[in-house]
């Protein structure tokens, strides 16, 4: 009874993409990173660091970021690392990249968010599986002197044990979707207003909310 209409009505999601057997979070990250670098007009040597946010890396090591580094020919003497912060991973990635550039030098950072969550879900659990898909996005950032506001509210300590999620590969991801939805609807407007206050901007000046 989990029809397309059921999913769209309750989530607003109309389309999701899943990896083929030959694809992974790493291959998606490489494809997105190549496109971002090409569109930036920069050369691989211009990238000062590579940060990849993912919780579904195909390998314990090497990291997805290091696989991107090798595939794109980024300098080997520049930092490349993964971070795991789930939904907020890309935002953390921006902050980590800014810190790396400011500390170690460099002008440009490649930040990637990629997931292959279809490999980690139970297709019979519609409270979770209808919400997630597979994909990757990448952006090249330039270090600037303008203010950078990042508002975070950590709730990463809540754990729902479902037979062994703490042991990689032993159980699918399980989530209380309704509770997460209620939290997101309440938290997002508060975060937006906090960031606007910190950057002395108004809502009328915002073109996109992603």
What are the language-model segments listed below?
Residues 32-48, 190-207:
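Phosphate/pyrophosphate-binding loops at sites that engage ATP/ADP/AMP, CoA/4′-phosphopantetheine
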Residues 4-27, 55-108:
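Conserved catalytic cysteine-centered active-site region
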Residues 51, 110-112, 139-141, 210:
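Structural motif
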Residues 4-5, 43-49, 76-79, 107-108, ...:
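Short acidic capping loops at alpha-helix termini that bridge into adjacent secondary structure
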Residues 7, 29, 36, 47-50, ...:
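Buried hydrophobic positions in well-ordered alpha/beta secondary-structure cores of metabolic enzymes
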Residues 98-133:
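Flexible, glycine-rich active-site loops centered on histidine and acidic residues
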Residues 53-58, 85-90, 113-118, 144, ...:
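Acidic, glycine-rich active-site loops and adjacent beta-strand->loop/helix elements
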Residues 1-22, 123-186, 190-194:
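Condensing-enzyme catalytic core mediating Claisen C-C bond formation in acyl metabolism
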């Amino acid at each position: 009874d989990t029809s397309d209409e059921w999913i769209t009505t309750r989530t607003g999601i109309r389309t999701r993409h899943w990896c083929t057997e030959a694809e992974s979070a790493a291959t998606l990250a490489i494809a997105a990173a190549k496109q971002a670098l090409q569109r930036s007009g920069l050369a691989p040597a211009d990238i000062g660091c590579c940060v990849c946010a993912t919780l579904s890396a195909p390998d314990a090591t090497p990291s997805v970021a290091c696989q991107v580094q090798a595939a794109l020919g980024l300098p080997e003497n520049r930092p490349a690392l993964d971070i795991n912060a789930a939904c907020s991973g890309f935002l953390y990635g921006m902050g980590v990249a800014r810190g790396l550039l400011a500390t170690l030098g460099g002008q440009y950072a490649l930040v990637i968010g990629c997931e292959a969550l279809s490999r980690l879900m139970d297709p019979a659990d519609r409270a979770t599986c209808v919400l997630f898909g597979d994909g990757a996005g990448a952006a090249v950032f330039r270090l600037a002197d303008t203010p950078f506001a990042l508002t975070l509210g950590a709730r990463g300590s809540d754990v729902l044990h479902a037979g062994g999620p703490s042991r990689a590969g032993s159980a699918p991801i399980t989530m209380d979707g309704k509770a997460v939805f209620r939290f997101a609807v309440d938290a997002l407007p508060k975060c937006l207003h906090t960031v606007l206050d910190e950057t002395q901007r108004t809502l009328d000046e915002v073109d996109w909310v992603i």
